[in-house]
Amino acid sequence: MSILLSPPSLLLLLAALVAPATSTTNYRPDWNRLRGLARGRVETCGGUQLNRLKEVKAFVTEDIQLYHNLVMKHLPGADPELVLLSRNYQELERIPLSQMTRDEINALVQELGFYRKSAPEAQVPPEYLWAPAKPPEEASEHDDL
């Protein structure tokens, strides 16, 4: 038994089969795993690897400095990754950035709750000082009971 598909149907089928294999940039946060997210670090090499990734390089050189609680760490030979950390610098998750565009990285960082300043030297509003983490809960009046 053979199944004949019209050209449009064949294209749709092909697109459906290829899409999952190419959708490496569609990172979806697992919020249960990211409980306690407080800061982030982008780890990448400073040279040749980054120079081949124009979009990632633009994010690293121009955008990181705009985000509160997000820093850059140069590691020789490292592929670019966003490392998500707890308040105690415990690693929660690593997200590869090599296949992402600058816009995708910015959207991801903002979705994760990092505050984007208007300029590198701009002040962070008080309500965002703990971003992306939630501020510590007020101590209960009954903690000593």
Curated annotation (Swiss-Prot):
The keyword Endoplasmic reticulum applies. It comes from the Eukaryota. The active site is at 45 (nucleophile), 48 (nucleophile). There is a cross-link at residues 45-48 (Cysteinyl-selenocysteine (Cys-Sec)). It is found in: Cytoplasm, Perinuclear region; Endoplasmic reticulum; Golgi apparatus. InterPro entries: Sep15/SelM_sf (IPR038219), Sep15_SelM (IPR039992), Sep15_SelM_dom (IPR014912), Thioredoxin-like_sf (IPR036249). GO terms for cellular component: endoplasmic reticulum; Golgi apparatus; perinuclear region of cytoplasm. Keywords: Cytoplasm, Endoplasmic reticulum, Golgi apparatus, Selenocysteine, Signal. Residues 1-23 form the signal peptide. Widely expressed. Highly expressed in brain. It holds the Pfam family Sep15_SelM. Its main location: cytoplasm. One of its GO terms (biological process) is corticosterone secretion. Residues 125-145 are annotated as: Disordered. The keyword Cytoplasm applies. Belongs to the selenoprotein M/F family. May function as a thiol-disulfide oxidoreductase that participates in disulfide bond formation. This is Selenoprotein M. It comes from Mus musculus (Mouse).
